[in-house]
Amino acid sequence: MNNNLLIIAGPTAVGKSDLSVDLAKKLNGEIISVDSMQIYKYMDIGSAKISKEEMGGVPHYLIDFVDPSKEFSVAEFKDLATEKIKDIQSRGKLPILVGGTGLYINSIICNMNFAESDKDEEYREELEKIANEHGNEYLHEMLKDIDLESYNSIHFNNRKRVIRALETYKLTGKPFSSFKAKNSIYETPYNIYYYVLNMDRAKLYDRINKRVDIMFEKGLLEEVKNLKAMGLTDDMQSMKGIGYKEVLYYLDGKISLEQCIEMIKQGSRNYAKRQLTWFRKDPRAIFIDKDTFASEEDISSKIINDIINS
């Protein structure tokens, strides 16, 4: 059994889904989504979830399976994805990771080891209180002396991750960063083919803006109203995603519809920028500038030739 793993990554709205379905059909592959928002049920429009029609008969996994009221960790994702990769490979097919959540991708290809089993709810509540009273930056500074690597790699506004890092140190006496890959971060159990799609920034931003407009045309407001009626609130993990938190602000009368739309567009553009920064840090990633190819077919052919000739 070969241990090949194809990855099609890239920023939001760059066009990963269409290419990956085409590749799956040509390479006898099955797709595992690596998108931290498409995991949730009932959240189709705001997450730009691929439709059954767009899947084109290609099996897709780890989409639409988590209740949005529940917490879901990277460690849980890694375990599920790893099992699915084994299953796909055991049937003689090629697993293809598709998405833009860099941490999800790294959890798999770097075989990251998460210390997720132990939790200290009382300490978490204490840290939440500190953050609420003094701010996220104050909480983030607490990491500096005990885990400089996590301090430098975790953004101060990622409160959940900062708290997890502080909690891990309290429980284990070891830095949270030490629970990542045991050896080099670039060592992987797979034979990977890692591609990152990109395009001219102005074109990408235009695609992002148009995608947001289409989301509203498709009924994003109604989708969030339904989620709100189900009891979902802005402090839940799922509702912190771009597109959902802003619509909640609008529905709560905190901002106008115009402000809501512009905030989603700006947030999505900023997210795309962060995604590209993340992918550029990995020397294994091969960037594909879509503007230099005449067609999607040419991109597909290039990737297939790389795999065949490797």
Swiss-Prot record:
It catalyses: adenosine(37) in tRNA + dimethylallyl diphosphate = N(6)-dimethylallyladenosine(37) in tRNA + diphosphate. It comes from the Bacteria. This is tRNA dimethylallyltransferase. Belongs to the IPP transferase family. GO terms for biological process: tRNA modification. Its EC number is 2.5.1.75. Catalyzes the transfer of a dimethylallyl group onto the adenine at position 37 in tRNAs that read codons beginning with uridine, leading to the formation of N6-(dimethylallyl)adenosine (i(6)A). Residues 35-38 are annotated as: Interaction with substrate tRNA. Monomer. ATP binds at G10, P11, T12, A13, V14, G15, K16, S17.
